[in-house]
From Swiss-Prot:
GO terms for cellular component: mitochondrial inner membrane; respiratory chain complex III. This is Cytochrome b. Heme b b562 binds at residues 83, 182. It is a multi-pass membrane protein. Its cofactor is heme b. Component of the ubiquinol-cytochrome c reductase complex (complex III or cytochrome b-c1 complex) that is part of the mitochondrial respiratory chain. The b-c1 complex mediates electron transfer from ubiquinol to cytochrome c. Contributes to the generation of a proton gradient across the mitochondrial membrane that is then used for ATP synthesis. One of its GO terms (biological process) is mitochondrial electron transport, ubiquinol to cytochrome c. The lineage of its organism: Eukaryota, Metazoa, Chordata, Craniata, Vertebrata. Binds 2 heme b groups non-covalently. GO terms for molecular function: metal ion binding; ubiquinol-cytochrome-c reductase activity. It comes from Voalavo gymnocaudus.
Amino acid sequence: MTNIRKTHPLLKIINHSFIDLPAPSNISSWWNFGSLLGICLMLQIITGLFLAMHYTSDTTTAFSSVTHICRDVNYGWLIRYLHANGASMFFICLFIHVGRGMYYGSYMSIETWNMGIILLFAVMATAFMGYVLPWGQMSFWGATVITNLLSAIPYIGTTLVEWIWGGFSVDKATLTRFFAFHFILPFIIVALVMVHLLFLHETGSNNPSGLNSDADKIPFHPYYTIKDILGIFLLLLFLMSLVLFTPDLLGDPDNYTPANPLNTPPHIKPEWYFLFAYAILRSIPNKLGGVLALILSILVLALLPHLHTSKQQSLMFRPLTQTLYWILVADLLTLTWIGGQPVEYPFIIIGQLASILYFVTILILMPMAGMIEDNILKMT
């Protein structure tokens, strides 16, 4: 008798996606982060749902409702900090996932890669709106500064900003709509993830060597399910250590002060995972130029398949491009540090140099290195 998982219409889909899926036999732990992102997304939706049961999206009570969750709701403090730090874990996994895609040339599966970029934008939008909800000082001023960037759009900018605000400043209407969008977007992300996986299973997974692995496939279960479970345990260990020992490590102390439109904080900055993009935005003196650079800092990823000049897909056997890749990683860490610093010398010039290096490395140096490596191989 045929196993039900292979015949049942619904179970058959799950079977082909997570059980009998043919996977390359040599994929390393860097391939764990896709499943970890799935766990993070589920965790965020579950904790977010419980928080939404007690949260009120009104400017007069939003801050108090978050305090009420932490003080009066059973394990409310745990749910709140799991949600806040879960977002940080989500972005750590996201950055590693994208970094792995860049290192091993996974961007050559163009549909999967482009879907991933759309997902990245959706997650960033969700995280930004979530940061506004506690209605602390940094929530309010972060929302004001970031939404104000749209006013740089010629002709329609100011009208667009006021339309998003629902008035002439960030107020009750803004908070209510941000809560509505923050609630619905994760479910849209789940749908996009399904499309992402659909595209992935059309071509199959890439592997560290960058070579075709059709000749050497193994079933996903039990080999990679057990490997993913180990990754999940390590992720939860790290997350729980963060939540139970230093829950405010990655937050901003200013957000424990209720929002006050009459008092601007000395340094307005977003959460740590947006600092690299914020540094690129600030490094250009022109407002519209800064906004374009901000968007391009993520959109540049869509150009990677077209900038690939090497005959080899992966960087595994390409030492020159490998060096440039790690320079890029160091550059992004520098930008993250600069984004959290005040706008003064020497941080301004460091930010500008790091921003230039970011775009030059991706758009010019890495494609050139690919061609040089190919020529060296021809000569030997």
